[in-house]
Amino acid sequence: MTDQRPLTIALVAGETSGDILGAGLIRALKERVPNARFVGVAGPRMQAEGCEAWYEIEELAVMGIVEVLGRLRRLLHIRADLTKRFGELKPDVFVGIDAPDFNITLEGNLKKQGIKTIHYVSPSVWAWRQKRVFKIGRATDLVLAFLPFEKAFYDKYNVPCRFIGHTMADAMPLDPDKNGARDVLGIPYDAHCLALLPGSRGAEVEMLSADFLKTAQLLRQTYPDLEIVVPLVNAKRREQFERIKAEVAPDLSVHLLDGMGREAMVASDAALLASGTAALECMLAKCPMVVGYRMKPFTFWLAKRLVKTDYVSLPNLLAGRELVKELLQEECEPQKLAAALLPLLANGKTSHAMHDTFRELHQQIRCNADEQAAQAVLELAQ
């Protein structure tokens, strides 16, 4: 940091989730250093906090091999331009927020020019393609990790890493208002309630919806009053789910929701969901769950050989044991899913024990992540 200019932080966020993280980080930094300058690739939230956008976030937000290949020349041009302009600007710290395929190479380019670099949000190196940890170690001065087992992984390879807690854990209350969520969704307080979350991607909804619906039909036989809520991320996924339901379970009454996944989890006695961030959110909502997941046979075969962890869901990875049932591939079928969910819907010892462990894990990762990230940036900038 020089006396002639304000603290200057360069940031690159690659998608909406990164824009949210970036905005929280900028807000926390401005509280400590009001005249700091922020520049880089930013979305509307980061810009609203005062970040100067050299490129809009949409430029980097591409998914899938075909889309990336179609935009590759443009992406490479942006990375080369940022390498040059950040090299001239010499920010006090560069923060690459997620988007590892784009940011880690950029971080390496900048580190070679003497710029201090942080990678915010660890890629899943602990799960697969573990050798990426060496590239990350060469490219960054510090990794900011959401989860404690991520820091333990980096420590093993002597890559500087700081566990800052998870922003989602900060945003969600330790004791959610179940009745309040039921009021919002129109669910009676005394009814049994099941949330079905078949995923946010088209392929997931296609592979999981039929089995999830058949599971709900089986559970209705035991609990005739069972309310079923199905939050879907957008109109496309809703249309897809409705088509599958018309074929598989046309007479099954369900509450279809546009978004409102968090409310559905808080309101429910149990959830059946695809793995991913939804499992972490469900844990933070204190909703007992079963994880069911299917993929194409070759993809599953490949994943089994690449993935180095014993579990796929974040609650189990955090607990270091099978806290929630994971039924994958052939095991992801209605009879087994229903059998795993029945004791959870009973609201007995099983679900109470799970709820208590969820609360303990929530406290472990509720560390005021924005403040922790800001502190790490300022320490590196010294």
UniProtKB/Swiss-Prot annotation:
Keyword terms: Glycosyltransferase, Lipid A biosynthesis, Lipid biosynthesis, Lipid metabolism, Transferase
Enzyme class, first EC level, given as a word: transferase
Matching InterPro entries: Glyco_trans_19 (IPR003835)
Keyword set includes Glycosyltransferase: yes
Catalytic activity: 2-N,3-O-bis[(3R)-3-hydroxytetradecanoyl]-alpha-D-glucosaminyl 1-phosphate + UDP-2-N,3-O-bis[(3R)-3-hydroxytetradecanoyl]-alpha-D-glucosamine = lipid A disaccharide (E. coli) + UDP + H(+); a lipid X + a UDP-2-N,3-O-bis[(3R)-3-hydroxyacyl]-alpha-D-glucosamine = a lipid A disaccharide + UDP + H(+)
Pathway: Glycolipid biosynthesis; lipid IV(A) biosynthesis; lipid IV(A) from (3R)-3-hydroxytetradecanoyl-[acyl-carrier-protein] and UDP-N-acetyl-alpha-D-glucosamine: step 5/6
Cleaved signal peptide residues: none
The organism's place on the tree of life at top rank: Bacteria
EC number: 2.4.1.182
Any one of the GO CC terms: membrane
UniProt-listed GO biological process terms: lipid A biosynthetic process
UniProt-listed Pfam families: LpxB
One example GO MF annotation: lipid-A-disaccharide synthase activity
Keyword Nucleotide-binding: no
Cysteines joined through disulfide linkages: none
Similarity comment: Belongs to the LpxB family.
NCBIfam families to which the protein is assigned, alphabetical: lpxB
HAMAP family the record matches: LpxB (MF_00392)
Function recorded in the entry: Condensation of UDP-2,3-diacylglucosamine and 2,3-diacylglucosamine-1-phosphate to form lipid A disaccharide, a precursor of lipid A, a phosphorylated glycolipid that anchors the lipopolysaccharide to the outer membrane of the cell.
Name this protein carries in UniProt: Lipid-A-disaccharide synthase
